Regions:
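Residue-level detector of high-confidence beta-strand sites
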Residues: 81, 200-202
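Membrane-proximal periplasmic segments of bacterial cell-envelope enzymes
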Residues: 1-142, 165-186, 192
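Active-site loop and adjoining helix of the penicillin-binding protein/serine DD-peptidase-beta-lactamase fold
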Residues: 140-196, 200, 208-244
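A motif-centric feature for acidic-aromatic and gly/ser/thr-rich catalytic loops and repeats
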Residues: 205
Length: 244
């Protein structure tokens, strides 16, 4: 509390204030380099902050695009997930990224990050002496990243994942005779003429959107225990059996 000059007696409130001030100091806040202190706030909260801007000098509310996964865990190992750029990643790519950027962490979103990432625009901002934004306009428009098209058939991918999950559970339950300790597996569907991958499934999978909206400690431990991030279809080593 002394370090950040906090006089608040309520421990819970003091902790929240310290968290915000720590993030500000860690990210090197300045009038021209904002720090995100809250995401996905309600419309009510956003409007209250805007209407009472004089009470929150140096604070502004902005609308930003978000990454969504409309099909949930489908093709999670192929697509991968995105997350906030780490200090190490930022320091290695300061010329390309901002400390508040979201980048690909795994899968296609990591491998093709340089193609998927667009070009930042330039916004000219006028501020008052207390840091409050008084006027702003776009000096240079941002450019969207490239579109990446995969050979994956989404319907076939869904069927493949469902069949893989069912078969693993059936094997574990002894539906085919003897019970086995089956917990994981992989399946790949390839066009034998072109070599294109039409479906690629790995089980267990995960919900990539949780890494954006906020993953709980319980779910994180569950994923780590099951090694859910591991793409068994391309990284696993298995004795050959048969193919169809």
């Amino acid at each position: 509390k002394e370090k950040y000059g906090i006089n608040e007696e309520n421990i819970q409130k003091a902790r929240k204030i310290m968290t915000v001030r720590y993030e500000i100091s860690r990210n090197g806040y300045s009038n021209i380099k904002p720090v995100i202190i809250s995401k996905s706030i309600s419309y009510l909260s956003a409007n209250q902050i805007k209407e009472q801007s004089s009470s929150f000098p140096g604070t502004s509310v902005v609308t930003t695009p978000i990454v969504t996964y409309p099909y949930g865990s489908l093709a999670s190992h192929i697509l991968g997930y995105v997350g906030s750029i780490s200090s190490e990643e930022y320091n290695a790519n300061k010329e390309k990224y901002d400390i508040n950027d979201i980048i690909g962490k795994t899968g296609i979103q990591y491998t093709l990050e340089e193609y998927l990432k667009g070009e930042d625009g330039i916004r000219q901002v006028d501020m008052s002496v207390d840091g409050t934004i008084t006027e702003q306009h776009i000096a240079e428009e941002a450019e969207a990243g490239h579109t990446v098209t995969l050979t994956i058939d989404s319907n076939l991918q869904k069927v493949t994942e469902e069949a893989l999950k069912k078969n693993i559970k059936d094997i574990a339950n002894g539906s085919y005779g003897q019970k086995y300790n089956a917990k994981a597996g992989a399946a790949v569907v390839m066009d034998v003429k072109s070599g294109e991958i039409l479906a690629l499934a790995s089980y267990p999978d995960y919900e990539p959107e949780l890494f954006i909206s906020g993953i709980t400690q319980k779910k994180l431990e569950e994923y780590n225990k099951g090694n859910n991030y591991y793409n068994r279809a391309i990284s696993g080593t298995y004795a050959p059996r048969f193919s169809i």
